């Protein structure tokens, strides 16, 4: 059961819908009572999509995560998404700033993109005590608040890529 998996992973954990965006319906669970309450809500909300979710290890991060943009196998830019809240999504108020692409970050993004066949991707990473961790690979790319800090015309790069693939 989900409760057993949570107990096995250890607290805190993050419960996250399989389909979702903008940091919605994500819960940080810090103890068994919280887990039981959230799981009960999911069970009785009734909609099928509430019954399928990820259980992720909670990762301590420095008040930010990284969103990198990979288009056609090329990492074109990245931003930090910073927030005082543990959810570092711009739709939830996080602020963006430029993230320099180190060779390590670029290599991880390349490998993540290659693992799923590339295309147009937004790869969300976290900085942990063990290095970079890939949290999500998004094929529906949200680049709001990312064009200015990166200095990259992300929609233009997407259009160029799509045209080149169509030829």
Where are these regions (language model features)?
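A conserved helix-loop-beta module that forms one wall/lid of the active-site cleft
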Residues: 1-25
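Residues within well-ordered alpha-helical secondary structure of globular protein domains
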Residues: 8, 41-44, 164
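Protein kinase-like catalytic core scaffold
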Residues: 13, 54, 77, 121, ...
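Short strand-connecting beta-turns/loops that link adjacent beta-strands
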Residues: 20, 73, 128-131
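Short, solvent-exposed loop/turn segments at secondary-structure junctions
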Residues: 20, 83, 140
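Phosphate-binding site of ATP-dependent enzymes
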Residues: 24-116
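A short glycine-rich, hydrophobically flanked beta-strand micro-motif that places a catalytic Asp/Glu
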Residues: 56-57, 118-129
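C-terminal active-site "lid" helix and adjoining low-complexity regulatory extension at the edge
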Residues: 114, 127-167
